[in-house]
Amino acid sequence: EAKATAERHPDGIVNLSVGTPVDEVAPSIQQALADAAVEPGYPQTVGTPELRRAIVEWLERRYAVTGLEESNVLPVIGTKEAIALMPTHLGVGPGHTVVIPEVAYPTYEVAALVSGARPQRADSLMQLGPASPTFMFINTPSNPTGKILGLGHLRKVVDWAHQRGTIVASDECYIGLGWEGEPLSILNPDVNDGNITGLLAIHSLSKSSNLASYRAGFIAGRFDSQSNNFAVQHA
C-alpha cells in the first residue's frame, strides 16, 4: 500500500533498496576512465604507490585522519566482497564471535558466517557483558538508519576493543553523507589518541563518488599479522 502511494507521486518512486544512484558519474571521472582504457594490464595487488598516497592525503584532507602511511592502505575490488571476506582473512574462525549492529547491512552477518564464527547483534557494549569478541563491525553513518556514532561513543568502542584485542572494522561508506552532525572516522586521532592498532576503516567510491558498480574502494588502518594474507587473498 505504501509503495502504491509513493508510485502515484508526480515525481515517481525513489528505490532505496540497494542505494542505486540516479545522477550521472562526474564527467571528469568518465574522462579519466576513458583515458586509462588504452593501458591494459593487471593492477598491483596493493595498488600503485600513487594511488595509496592519494588515499592517505584524501583521508587527511577530508576527515582529519593523520599519521597514516601508504602501507596502511589497501585498495579493494568492491567493498562488499572485502567486507564478506575480511574476518576470514584476518584470522577469525570457528569458536570466535563477530559483533554486528542490530539493524545493518546484510553482508556483515554473511562475513561472520563465511568465517565460521558466531554473529552477535548488539548496538551497545553493555549488551556484550564481559565477553571478548574477536571482531566487530560498526557503521557510521548507519545504513539504513542514518545514525551517526558520536565522538564519545567511538572513543568508548576503541578503548573497549583495545583492552580486549578486538578488531574493529568501521564501515564509513556514507561518512560524507551525514544528515545530522559531522561523522567521524574511527581513524581520526580525536577518536583513538593516535593508536590505530586493530582499527580498520572501510570506504567505497560507490557512495562518495557516485560510482556504484565500478567496484572501487579501500580499507585503511593498522592490520595485524594477517595483513599480508588479507592483501594476497583479496587479489
What annotation goes with each model-predicted range?
Residues 23-26, 144-146, 176-177, 209-212:
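Short catalytic/ligand-binding loop motif for oxyanion handling, primarily in non-cytosolic enzymes
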Residues 169:
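Generic enzyme active-site microenvironment
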Residues 172:
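Walker B catalytic acidic pair
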